[in-house]
């Protein structure tokens, strides 16, 4: 039985974004291995019950300590050598680097999954500039592997990395995000409320844009355009970009947000909303919350950045706003809040766009074809 090994930083990220594709690969006859940093036993047990073989990498998601990196690299190489995968599929920067070096050394087929380029390519600090330089230098070495394929979620990231590295366009592919299953995320008509509901559901990082939404809330309420800002999300305690929980609770006490905490049933939150907002400046792929909202038929508003830009067609399926332009964000959100007919029309078109371009069945089919080609030809 041929082996596919997924190497990814976060166990929760694999469970949220990659399980459907991994299950499809398993159903196609592959033995599935998952190498990740498993925090506790909960997710690892769930994945094992699905028939995946799980391995703990102990790779810290947030640490930029080079000693820790090389210590983890030794363990990961030993683990990957033991697994001996026919295809290694790495997701996010650290796995791409560690797995990339491994595949180059052992001449293995590898897919490097760029689900956004990460904060290394966002922050202009001395430490990040050094890490970015080393990362790009490492990428150039890794990309020389003829069995290496670079998989992106949107064209913006592909164009940027091609401009920054010696990679060839012929060794790249764009697959439209993680996809979403429209048979699970059903279309529904929104409830037209006297006080509309805007949903923000994401990790609680400043770069995800909640602070900008709170500022917009203040401005619109002052104008007499009130709305409920529902906030659901994951608090990342050790992340320097994290919004302190004390700040979240303060906004809640002030009536600026309705803090819901971490919610497992995001689908119900989307159904209960009129608009879904994600004014993110984070370098990411296509945000899942926007895929889910579009499938349910909700108008979305987001900053005009790579992943959001590839999903939302401005003023047709939703609203795009110049990054960090809070004035325009306020204007466009007000337009959505005061135009129920416009929202519904956008929602219908969003659903159609999901079915034709972003359905998970399409993403799964494209991904399985990459595995088949790699195993049949030893290259892409």
Regions found by a protein language model. Give the residues of each.
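Membrane-proximal helix-turn-helix segments that form the acceptor-binding/catalytic region
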Residues: 23-25, 74-77, 105, 130-150
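Nucleotide-activated donor-binding/catalytic signature segment of Leloir-type glycosyltransferases, i.e.
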Residues: 242-263
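A short, active-site helix/loop in glycosyltransferases that binds the activated sugar's phosphate group
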Residues: 144-172, 179-182, 367
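Short hydrophobic beta-strand element within catalytic cores of glycosyltransferases
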Residues: 290, 299-302, 312
